[in-house]
UniProtKB/Swiss-Prot annotation:
GO cellular component: cytoplasm; endoplasmic reticulum; endoplasmic reticulum membrane; fungal-type vacuole; fungal-type vacuole membrane; membrane
Record's protein name: Probable ATP-dependent permease
Residue ranges occupied by any ABC transporter domain in the UniProt entry: 384-631
Residues recorded as bearing Phosphoserine in the entry: S659, S702
ABC transmembrane type-2 domain: residues covered: 793-1044
Gene Ontology terms describing biological process: transmembrane transport
Location of the protein in the cell: Endoplasmic reticulum membrane
CDD domains tied to this protein: ABCG_EPDR, EGF_Lam
Signal sequence extent: 1-25
One example GO MF annotation: ATP hydrolysis activity
Species, as recorded: Saccharomyces cerevisiae (strain ATCC 204508 / S288c) (Baker's yeast)
Designated gene of the protein: ADP1
Transmembrane segments: 325-345, 464-481, 794-814, 829-849, 878-898, 910-930, 938-958, 1001-1021, 1025-1045
Length: 1049
């Protein structure tokens, strides 16, 4: 064995001496990364006499092998080369760099023969696999937003590449200028390394090291890579391995080098050594050195958190003084804004001291001032005439067939007169009143409506009229005085002073005898307020306060007792007669004394005009046609009775007398009628019978509707017949002189030459300016805020719930950690917050449902523009309920949970929550505006929110959705953009650590976000999209309010 070693030593020594004799250059120390201009060529032995085509490369064949100890793929017969080499047998060095180029191409160029590598910017080494700059490592990071680090300290993290210059002086002297170098790469997870020995950048031999352990001596600042198994091979026909004029150590490398191998470095000086027992013996014998000494440079692309010795900053369990200052300033700012808003609102007319206060004296206006106000300066009056008003609607049972509701109704009413529209239930009174007031109708309207003989458009007509609905739609939290004042401030000319408007309010309240309840709230079914009759008078007061030229009232006495009904009608009569106003009202069953206060009458039955003209002449007309109202019988009741129709067949029945019904007599055997010209009984009996008839009218009608027409058995001639044929009465009126008088009166009004009609004394005041837009907005805001603080349940409940929920969440997620479980907690926290704010917005549906009918009524009566109401609702309801809660929640949750306070993350979080809360509330409000039914709007809102939640990014990774039908649905989810932006704002800059398998694994928060399908760079983009959602739904809500929420009867 000793002789064998001596032989090897002598052989190597002879080779080194021979090499020294042919070297022309002198020894020179060359840095490892310095380029060389050597043009040495590899010597290749070719058998020129062999003309046979060589077999294709197949590493499975014994004549071929994979260099660098690369693995052979048994399926393809190709070598799977280690990093830095290519070619069929992995013998060709690669250049360029480890990272892909700008186009993403990872194919590295092969080094040209007899040339050196030209490395890409940021890479170095013989094979261009040692990083030099940090930026080249960005390509190896899991997300483009994460920056990589070129770690050059030499301690392996995952896979390190090193390049070394041999520094043994005797070896350098013997090579006489040729540069010996080593490339060394280790793979820590696989516990293996590879080693290449180069002379003038031409590979001579290589080694593979396995079963490696990687140790560090932190005290000495050294690293030790120990590999138990080492195997080496020569590259044929190279220096030291059979090149011409050189010795061949192939057998020595293959048979003698077995390991263990040790690669140790001083990490401060970068001085390294490579030792292996057999190789050490050779070096010691020949050169006198115990091992190969090296000067190395290494590089490994890692994330900064993976650098050995790196310690992630510990999470401060308490809020810093800067954070406390931010929280305090934010709280002060919110309080200041609230104070300013309160002060601004208190300056509104509805909030002035003394208005409507029970302690303030009531100063009624002077009579002259009121008269001057009620009477127009130009003495403009309005005569309303209408001809052949016909209204039809599509029939439910017949396709394409229209059902006539009103048929050719005509009439006229002049200033100072009251026109009453009467008839039984279903006669068409309210329909005719709506048409005369030019309300929007769903059916087809024909005929003409003129004021002073001139046709007017709906917009101009609405400015000179007032309309009192049959039902009372009033804000329940306002007082009587505030309700009427609200109408006055919004609708009276803005040129009038506030004192003049207030004086008019007091006067109207006095006229309607509700001045004593002026400080009582309206109330509703939950909060007791004024009575139903008082509400009716308040509704009338809201219209009377504007002193319209034409006032329409639908059942003004409905719900009032006899005394109050008489007071209301007398007030209307005074308004009509004293101030020459034109009044049109529908009324069902007035008292007789009220009936005789009417100037004009339109009597309807089943949509047909039975009479139209002077109210006092209706008895004369009926008497002429054989219908005589009994003495002491209410003429209004009598008119309803005679227009009552028995049924679709026009059936009639006969009644002998009222006492028969009272006594229970079988009316099928009686022949009598209500209307008779002579009476067989005494006057007292007759009076009692008619009194009984008035009290039991509905019972008699029921009998008339259900019984068959039966002829009496006694055949007495004293009884007369109840003629219920509406068509007959209609035809009789059309043929009467009264209809002719009506037609002539209408013609006179239409005639421009009629100077005595006194109805064309001035132009109609359609251009009168009421409150401007800003005035409307101020009044509506003050009204809404007053409504809010008098009924603070919704506002305070929202705030209280938000505070309690914030405390609960702060306690549950207290001091959330910076690890994977902390990331999960953050996801759950933000998702729950968004879900809470999302479903709380449902309160907007119920609040608008209560206001919808009030808005429709006030809009149709020209209180304000839809835009003023919409902006007022946003300012007075959406802002307090959707802006303040996110701020309160953030002020509590942020310090308790210890969320990220860096880079203004706190303010960004507040902004994101506010934008989301506003956006989702506007979306829900838009749905509530579009759908009139509250149940339908709630169902659709739930579906919208659930769909938005599904695509928020928590329940499904939106990047992995391949179905085209669902792939882009996240783009319509407000939750997705809010959720993504909140997570990015919180986690992007955090380093999350986790203890797994005994290792402290650190993962950038941005990496986890990318895993969940979120795009880390989208923070600003998401915020812009949230703002866009707000703008879109804000516009959609207004357009829906303007075009959908309109009065249509």
């Amino acid at each position: 064995m000793g002789s064998h070693r001596r032989y090897l030593y002598y052989s190597i020594l002879s080779f080194l001496l021979l090499s020294c004799s042919v070297v022309l250059a002198k020894q020179d120390k060359t840095p490892f990364f310095e380029g060389t201009s050597s043009k040495n060529s590899r010597l290749t032995a070719q058998d020129k006499g062999n003309d046979t085509c060589p077999p294709c490369f197949n590493c499975m064949l014994p004549i071929f092998e994979c260099k660098q100890f690369s693995e052979c793929n048994s399926y393809t017969g190709r070598c799977e080369c280690i990093e830095g080499f290519a070619g069929d047998d992995c013998s060709l060095p690669l250049c360029g760099g480890l990272s892909p180029d700008e186009s993403g191409n990872k194919d590295r160029p092969i080094r040209a023969q007899n040339d050196t590598c030209h490395c890409d910017n940021g890479w170095g080494g013989i094979n261009c696999d040692v990083c030099q700059e940090d930026f080249v490592c960005d390509a190896f990071m899991p997300d483009p937003s994460i920056k990589g680090t070129c770690y050059k300290n030499g301690m392996i993290v995952d896979k390190v590449f090193s390049g070394c210059n041999v520094t043994n002086e005797k070896i350098l002297q013997i090579l006489n200028g040729k540069i010996p170098q080593i490339t060394f790469a280790c793979d820590k997870p696989n516990q293996e390394c590879n080693f290449q020995f180069w002379i003038d950048q031409l590979e001579s031999f290589y080694c593979g090291l396995s079963d490696c352990a990687f140790e560090y001596d932190l005290e000495q600042n050294t690293s030790h890579y120990k590999c138990n198994d080492v195997q080496c091979k020569c590259v044929p026909d190279t220096v030291l391995c059979g090149a011409k004029g050189s010795i061949d150590i192939s057998d020595f490398l293959t048979e003698t080098i077995k390991g263990p191998g040790d690669f140790s470095c001083d990490l401060e000086t970068r001085q390294c050594k490579f030792s292996e027992p057999s190789m050490n013996d050779l070096i010691l014998t020949v050169f006198g050195d115990p091992y190969i000494t090296l000067k190395c440079e290494s590089g490994e692309c890692v994330h900064y958190s993976e650098i050995p010795g790196y310690k992630s900053p510990s999470k401060d369990p308490t809020v810093s003084w800067q954070g406390k200052l931010v929280l305090a300033l934010t709280a002060v700012m919110v309080l200041a804004l609230f104070t300013f808003a309160t002060f601004y609102i208190s300056k509104s007319p509805l909030f002035r001291n003394g208005l409507g206060s029970s302690k303030s004296p009531i100063r009624l206006p002077d009579e002259d001032a009121v008269n001057n106000f009620l009477q127009n300066e130009d003495d403009t009056l309005a005569t309303l005439s209408f001809e052949n008003i016909t209204y039809s609607v599509p029939s439910i049972n017949s396709d394409g067939v229209e059902e006539t509701v009103l048929n050719e109704i005509s009439g006229i009413v002049k200033p100072g007169q009251i026109l009453a529209i009467m008839g039984g239930s279903g006669a068409g009174k309210t329909t005719l009143l709506d048409i005369l007031a030019m309300k929007r109708k769903t059916g087809h309207v024909s005929g003409s409506i003129k004021v002073n003989g001139i046709s007017m458009d709906r917009k101009s007509f609405s400015k000179i009229i007032g309309f009192v609905d049959q039902d009372d739609f009033l804000l329940p939290t306002l007082t009587v005085f505030e309700t009427v004042l609200n109408s006055a401030l919004l609708r009276l000319p803005k040129a009038l002073s506030f004192e003049a408007k207030k004086a008019r309010v007091y006067k109207v309240l006095e006229e309607l005898r509700i001045i004593d309840i002026k400080d009582r709230i309206i109330g509703n079914e939950f909060d007791r307020g004024i009575s139903g009759g008082e509400k009716r008078r308040v509704s009338i007061a809201c219209e009377l306060v504007t002193s319209p030229l034409v006032l329409f009232l639908d059942e003004p006495t409905s719900g009032l007792d006899a005394s109050n009904a008489n007071n209301v009608i007398e007030c209307l009569v005074r308004l009509s007669s004293d101030y020459n106003r034109t009044l049109v009202l529908s009324i069902h069953q007035p008292r007789s004394n009220i009936f005789y206060l009417f100037d004009k009458l339109v009597l309807l039955s089943k949509g047909e005009m039975v009479y139209s003209g002077n109210a006092k002449k209706v008895s004369e007309f009926l008497r002429n046609e054989g219908y005589i109202c009994p003495d002491n019988y209410n003429i209004a009741d009598y008119l309803i009775d005679i227009t009552f129709e028995a049924g679709p067949q026009g059936k009639r029945r006969r009644i002998r007398n009222i006492s028969d019904l009272e006594a229970g007599t079988d009316t099928n055997d009686i022949d009598n009628t209500i209307h008779q010209t002579t009476f067989t009984s005494s006057d007292g009996t007759t009076q009692r019978e008619w009194a009984h008839l008035a009290a039991h009218r509905d019972e008699i009608r029921s009998l008339l509707r259900d019984e068959e027409d039966v002829e009496g058995t006694d055949g007495r001639r004293g009884a007369t017949e109840i003629d219920l044929n509406t068509k007959l009465l209609h035809d009789k009126y059309k043929d009467s002189v009264y209809y002719a008088e009506l037609s002539q009166e209408i013609e006179e009004v239409l005639s421009e030459g009629d100077e005595e009609s006194n109805v064309l004394n001035g132009d109609l005041p359609t251009g009168q300016q009421s409150a401007g837009f800003l005035q409307q907005l101020s009044i509506l805001n003050s009204r809404s805020f007053k409504n809010m603080y008098r009924n603070p349940k919704l506002l305070l409940g929202n705030y209280l719930l938000t505070i309690l929920l914030s405390l609960f969440l702060g306690t549950l997620y207290y001091n959330v950690s910076n690890d994977i479980s902390g990331f999960q907690n953050r996801m759950g926290l933000f998702f729950f917050i968004l879900t809470y704010f999302g479903f709380v917005t449902f309160t907007g549906l119920s609040s608008f449902a209560l206001e919808r009918i009030i808005f429709i009524k006030e809009r149709s009566n020209n209180y304000y523009s839809p835009l003023a109401y919409y902006i007022s609702k946003i300012m007075s309801e959406v802002v307090p309920l959707r802006v303040v809660p996110p701020i309160l929640l953030s002020l509590i949750v942020y310090p308790m949970t210890g969320l990220n306070m860096k880079d203004n993350a706190f303010f960004k979080c507040i902004g994101i929550l506010i934008l989301f809360n506003l956006g989702i509330s506007l979306e829900i409000l838009t749905i509530g505006i579009i759908f009139e039914d509250l149940n339908n709007s709630i169902i659709l809102s739930v579906l919208v929110l659930l769909g938005s939640l599904l695509f928020s990014g928590l329940f499904i990774n939106t990047k992995n959705i391949t179905n085209v039908a669902f792939k882009y649905l996240k783009n319509f989810s407000v939750f997705y953009y809010a959720y993504e932006s909140l997570l990015i704002n919180e986690v992007k800059t955090l380093m999350l650590k986790e203890r797994k398998y005994g290792l402290n694994i650190e993962v950038p928060g941005a990496t986890i976000l990318s895993t969940f399908g979120f795009v880390v760079q989208n923070l600003v983009f998401d915020i812009k999209i949230l703002a866009l959602f707000n703008v879109v739904f804000l516009i959609m809500g207004y357009l829906a309010l303007k075009w959908i929420v309109v009065e249509q009867k």
